[in-house]
A protein has these predicted regions:
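Internal gly/pro-rich beta-alpha loop/helix module
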Residues: 133-219
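Active-site segments that bind and position negatively charged phosphate/pyrophosphate groups
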Residues: 262-339, 347-348
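An N-terminal, well-structured beta->alpha segment
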Residues: 1-41, 49-50
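Glycine-rich oxoanion-binding loops at beta->alpha junctions
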Residues: 69-111, 152-153, 157-158
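A glycine- and small-aliphatic-rich helix-loop capping segment at beta-alpha/alpha-beta transitions
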Residues: 53-62, 80-83, 103, 107, ...
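Internal helix-turn-beta structural module
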Residues: 323-409
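Accessory alpha-helical/coil subdomains and C-terminal extensions
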Residues: 158, 179, 201-282, 286
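Short beta-strand segments
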Residues: 41-43, 66-69, 116-121, 180-186, ...
């Protein structure tokens, strides 16, 4: 199983390297014409790396700027750019203060000026100017993360509680031109949902927001409920958008890495949005069914699963997926299943995801635990830590969803 685990590491490392935003940002900026001042605003988990690439490409054409990213994701200083770190997945005071700085930088611009807006996943929490008290927004965010809502439902509500989401940041920047380079972390690349669409016309409606609030029985103040009933901007005439990077590229890179190692890869889907533990069980069962096929196989899926919080443990969707798969492949000597977040973080943990092999369940039992006990408590992190199956990469500098693979030798 050691060789299989090394194969897994090679595959997820190469896949993530293939979707780092550096070259993609440079391509997006190639040939772009910025006649006046250029103000850089980068928000999201990949913001630092995207901004660094932009400064490398444009140099002194950038007058000033700000990077807003997650704690631990800034990788040093960038000449002429202020770097701020803030809270994720729940916004904190640093999220609010950094947004105020960005709003100040982009006030009173002219039609000749350009806001170079570099956006990636995580921006919903990191770049925030709430229309309700900050503590109330934090509570609503926590409810949304715990209730099992998908990312579109979550961001449909977030947009209406913010002065910078749902196209409102684009309005703030007007009459300046906003040139947006967006790294997609949502299945299907809906630009108005990525980081809650600060510069994109909103395709959702107030009816959608109110329906989601009712569906999940959210506790809302009268002020918040009133904001959900208000429409967001439906046009953004001062914006040019270039989407770069996606989970499709991540899965394709994973498939190439599998072929490098002699596996025959099959991409099952690049738009997985099911419940993490159910997806993990299916992936593990599929690997088990093919355990005696005689040729190395790799089954790959990408997307963003959801976690239903039923306990008070620690973990993330990728860790839950891997642990659920462990129960299906217990005892198998020729199977490994892993699941990772391309940004290097999975839930409120220091792990990127998790891995399971045929011995994971046995090692878990030696720690006095079972998969059946751990998953309802959402405590996959501690379980995989006990079995030595956490995947820890550190912040990667990109963010294009998650991917998982089952390897069969």
């Amino acid at each position: 199983m050691g060789a299989l685990r090394e194969d897994a590491k090679y595959i997820y490392t190469r896949a993530i390297e293939a979707v780092l935003p550096d070259e993609a940002v440079r391509r997006a900026l190639d040939g772009a014409d910025f006649p006046g001042r250029v103000i850089l605003v980068a928000a999201g988990k990949a913001a630092w790396r995207m901004a660094s690439a932009a400064v490398s490409a444009l140099g002194e054409r950038i007058d000033t700027g700000i990077v807003i990213t997650k704690y631990g994701h800034a990788q040093g200083t960038i000449p002429g750019i202020v770097c701020r770190e803030a809270g994720h997945p729940v916004p904190d005071e640093n999220s609010f203060s950094a947004a105020r700085e960005a709003l100040a930088l982009t006030e009173n611009l002219t039609a000749d000026d350009t806001v170079l807006f570099l956006l990636s996943g995580g921006g919903s929490a990191l770049f925030e100017s709430p229309l309700v008290p900050g503590v109330e927004l934090q509570d609503i965010t926590a409810q949304l993360l715990a209730c099992g809502a998908d990312i579109v439902e979550i961001n449909t509500i977030r947009k209406r509680l913010s002065a910078v989401k749902g196209g409102r940041f684009a309005r703030h920047c007007a009459p300046a031109h906003v040139f947006a380079v967006i790294l997609s972390d949502i299945v299907g690349d809906p630009v108005d949902m990525i980081a809650s669409g600060p510069v994109s016309p909103d395709s959702s409606t107030c009816a959608d927001a109110l329906a989601a609030a009712e569906k999940y029985a959210l506790r809302l103040s009268d002020t918040a409920r009133g904001l959900l009933a208000q429409e967001t901007p439906k046009t953004a005439d001062n914006v040019t958008v270039r989407v770069t990077g996606s989970v499709r590229e991540l899965c394709a890179a994973a498939a190439k890495a599998c072929r490098d190692l002699g596996y025959t890869p099959e991409i099952l889907t690049d738009c997985e949005q099911g419940v993490a533990r159910e997806v993990g069980a299916r992936l593990g069962a599929l690997a088990r069914e093919n355990a005696s096929c005689g040729t190395p196989r790799a089954f790959i899926l990408g997307g963003e699963t959801v976690v239903r919080l039923t306990g008070n443990g620690k973990g993330g969707r990728n860790q839950e997926l891997a642990l659920a798969a462990a129960a299906e492949i217990a005892g198998a000597e020729n199977i490994v299943v892993f699941s990772v977040g391309s940004d290097g973080t999975d839930g409120p943990t220091d792990a990127a995801g998790g891995l399971a092999d045929g011995g994971t369940v046995e090692r878990l039992a030696a720690a006095g635990k079972t998969v059946a006990d751990v998953l309802p408590n959402n405590d996959a992190y501690h379980a995989l830590r006990d079995t030595g199956d956490l995947i820890i990469t550190g912040p990667t500098g990109t963010n294009v969803n998650d991917f998982a693979a089952a390897l069969v030798r």
